[in-house]
Amino acid sequence: MPRSARVRTLLLGLLGAVALVAVPLTQTASATPEQSYETSVFNNTNVQRVKYDRVKLKGSRCLDGFAERHAKRMATERRMYHQQLGPILKACNLSMVGENVAYGYPNGRAAVTAWMKSPGHKANILNTKYRLIAVGAYQDKDGRWYVAQVFGRSA
């Protein structure tokens, strides 16, 4: 086989392999409504922080479990309340922790907008000492959203 034919065959083989690998990647499941809401809160929180010259917060797996469980608990009980923060401090090895909670907002952007209109919630979002964030969002049986936003700083 001439050299040009071998190169063409090799290139076609490589393109076929790339196509086979690319197909499954485009067929991945889309984000759940909870994940979309959480991502919106996360991103909109960082938009506000940048707007006020604060560093962007990074996600935390440890905090994430607490935020998600609390949002689910609030939705299941159909009431909004703060969770105990002491266990989070210890479990996630933090020097400080804070929380914003909300319910009834149709999306993450609306929740962050409301928090920014409340001095205490805004102070949490813009606190220069926080470096970590996690968000949990869950709907009750009537479709009403409950969200927990947990902030932290490593010890």
Model-flagged regions — what are they?
Residues 2-14, 21-155:
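Functional surface patches built around histidine and acidic residues
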